[in-house]
Structure formats: structure tokens, C-alpha cells
UniProtKB/Swiss-Prot annotation:
Cleaved signal peptide residues: 1-21
InterPro entries per UniProt: UPF0319 (IPR018635)
Database matches in HAMAP family: UPF0319 (MF_00789)
Listed name of the protein: UPF0319 protein SO_1816
Membership in a protein family: Belongs to the UPF0319 family.
PANTHER family tied to this protein: UPF0319 PROTEIN YCCT
Keywords attached to this entry: Signal
Length: 226
């Protein structure tokens, strides 16, 4: 019986520590790149929807990416923004949510990617102290880096460096935006040209043609190859 009190006290302490962290949640159309100077392991094949944040000020690099209908064909193409950095002041075990300023549905993804406007809210409707700064860092697509031998810009690494630099900025309830440039990949080739296309184009083409089940199976295989 003498050991019950210390063990109970320890459990209380552990329980208190476990609930002290907050979570930052993002939609599928956004991707984490870095947190406080460190890369975040995430990709189009393995989306990370939340980050655990301890109390204090954090810098998170995020990017918007979406698949949209091509203007000149019946196929689809990818559009993505340059990274933007969210400086967030965490003051408790809150659930934070990031979304586009216009709402859950982005009506014009290509326009949005050129200058992403986002807002952060809390599940308890409390005030959120944060600041958003856009960058003009660009990167080749995941597929391009997977199949090409050239030296692509490491956006995650650059973003990690950016989030690791201390910035004297006063967090504000609203976001401050800077112009951002978007990078859209070339439209996938059609079936008649797929045979003569490079590996990147072929993979992109068949990905767009596959159904949901096939995509999930491919994602599982691709992750196992990384």
C-alpha cells in the first residue's frame, strides 16, 4: 500500500505532461515542410495532417498543393505554392487549425497558389497569436526529383533553415502576407505519347488515370521504396 501514493502521483505527473502539448492541423491540400529548423517527413504519398507543438513560439514552413483541371485539355495538372512560414505562439494544449482564408474550399487553386491567404483558428474559439510570411523558394516536384538526375532545389532543407532563424516579429491575430510565386508542373502527356515520355511523365500520366484503390496500393509500394 505504501507504493500506491508515489505511483499515483507519478501517473498524475505523466498525465499532466502528456496533455501540455498542442496540435497544429492542416487540410490535405497543405503540406508541412519544416518545423523550427528541422525537416518534417511528409509527401504526396504520406500526408502528415498534424504537428505536436510544445508551449512557446514555433516557426512552421507549409506549402499549398492541389490537383486541378488543365485549361487546354481533359487531363489534370498539379499546382503548388512556394512555402510560407507560420510563426505561432502556443500558450496551452490547444487544437489549432489552418485553412485558406476564403474557407474550406479554394475556388481558384491557381490564383490561390500565387498568393496563399491562410488563417489559424483554435477549437475553443480563443485568440490565436500568429504571423504568416511568404517566400519565393521553388522546387521541382516529388516525381521529378525521384526520376531525374539533376540537382533540384531542396525546399524542405531551405525551409528548415528559414524556420531555424530567429525573427524579431510581434505575433498578431491576423496574418501578414508577402507576394508568393507558384510553380505548376507540365500537364501530363496523353496515352498516345506515354510510350515515348520520360519516366516522370509516364508515372504522372498513369497516376492520374488510376482509381482510388490503385493509387493507395501504389502509395504503399512507393513508401516502401523510399
Amino acid at each position: 500500500m505504501k507504493s500506491l501514493l508515489p505511483i499515483s502521483s507519478l501517473l498524475v505527473l505523466l498525465g499532466s505532461a502528456s496533455v501540455s502539448a498542442a496540435d497544429l492541423n492542416i487540410p490535405m491540400s497543405f503540406e508541412y515542410l519544416a518545423l523550427d529548423g528541422k525537416k518534417v517527413e511528409s509527401s504526396v504519398f504520406n500526408h502528415k495532417s498534424s504537428l505536436e507543438l510544445a508551449p512557446g513560439t514555433h516557426k512552421v514552413a507549409i506549402r499549398y498543393h492541389e490537383m486541378v483541371e488543365d485549361d487546354f485539355s481533359d487531363s489534370q495538372t498539379f499546382v503548388k505554392s512556394s512555402p510560407f512560414i507560420v510563426t505561432l505562439e502556443v500558450d496551452g494544449d490547444h487544437q489549432y487549425y489552418l485553412q485558406a482564408a476564403e474557407g474550406k474550399v479554394v475556388k481558384k487553386p491557381k490564383v490561390f497558389a500565387q498568393n496563399p491567404q491562410v488563417v489559424l483558428t483554435r477549437a475553443d474559439k480563443g485568440q490565436v497569436n500568429y504571423q504568416v510570411t511568404n517566400t519565393n523558394i521553388e522546387e521541382e516536384s516529388f516525381v521529378s526529383r525521384l526520376f531525374s538526375g539533376n540537382q533540384a532545389v531542396d525546399v524542405s532543407g531551405t525551409a528548415a533553415t528559414a524556420t531555424g532563424v530567429a525573427v524579431a516579429a510581434t505575433p498578431a491575430p491576423t496574418s501578414a502576407q508577402v507576394a508568393v510565386s507558384a510553380t505548376a508542373t507540365t500537364s501530363p502527356t496523353d496515352a498516345s505519347k506515354a510510350t515515348g515520355a520520360n519516366p516522370q511523365q509516364m508515372l504522372q500520366y498513369w497516376w492520374l488515370q488510376a482509381d482510388e484503390k490503385t493509387r493507395k496500393e501504389f502509395m504503399s509500394w512507393a513508401i516502401s521504396q523510399l
